[in-house]
């Protein structure tokens, strides 16, 4: 009975994700990082003058406001940035 219970616990732990963690792209989208607790948004920062070339990507807790020179795009799904 103990073996059955232990097996059930192990299978449940393996099958269920015990804490969802967001994955965000780094500057080079081939690589990504797992965000720490509390950082539940991915972001991409780029210069307004060159919108096709991101300057920075990563995890963040609150999406910053864009300015006349810098634009931020935020999202909340895996590798969406």
Curated annotation (Swiss-Prot):
Predominant location: secreted
InterPro entries in UniProt: Cytotoxin_Cobra, Snake_3FTx, Snake_toxin-like_sf, Snake_toxin_con_site, Toxin_cobra-type
SS bond partners: 24-42, 35-59, 63-74, 75-80
GO MF terms held by the record: toxin activity
CDD domains: TFP_snake_toxin
Tissues in which the protein is found: Expressed by the venom gland.
Keywords, ordered alphabetically: Cardiotoxin, Cytolysis, Disulfide bond, Membrane, Secreted, Signal, Target cell membrane, Target membrane, Toxin
Gene Ontology CC: extracellular region; membrane; other organism cell membrane
Leader sequence residues: 1-21
One BP term from GO: killing of cells of another organism
Membrane-traversing stretches: none
Protein localization: Secreted; Target cell membrane
Domain of life where this protein originates: Eukaryota
Subunit relationships: Monomer in solution; Homodimer and oligomer in the presence of negatively charged lipids forming a pore with a size ranging between 20 and 30 Angstroms.
Annotated function: Shows cytolytic activity on many different cells by forming pore in lipid membranes. In vivo, increases heart rate or kills the animal by cardiac arrest. In addition, it binds to heparin with high affinity, interacts with Kv channel-interacting protein 1 (KCNIP1) in a calcium-independent manner, and binds to integrin alpha-V/beta-3 (ITGAV/ITGB3) with moderate affinity.
Similarity field: Belongs to the three-finger toxin family. Short-chain subfamily. Type IA cytotoxin sub-subfamily.
The protein, known as: Cytotoxin 2b
Taxon lineage: Eukaryota, Metazoa, Chordata, Craniata, Vertebrata
């Amino acid at each position: 009975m103990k073996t059955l219970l232990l097996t059930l616990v192990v299978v449940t732990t393996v099958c269920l994700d015990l804490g969802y963690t967001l994955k965000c792209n780094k500057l080079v989208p081939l690589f990504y990082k797992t965000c720490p607790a509390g950082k539940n948004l991915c972001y991409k920062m780029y210069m307004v003058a060159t919108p096709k070339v991101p300057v920075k990507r990563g995890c963040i807790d609150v999406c910053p406001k864009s300015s006349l020179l810098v634009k931020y795009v935020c999202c909340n799904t895996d590798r969406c940035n």
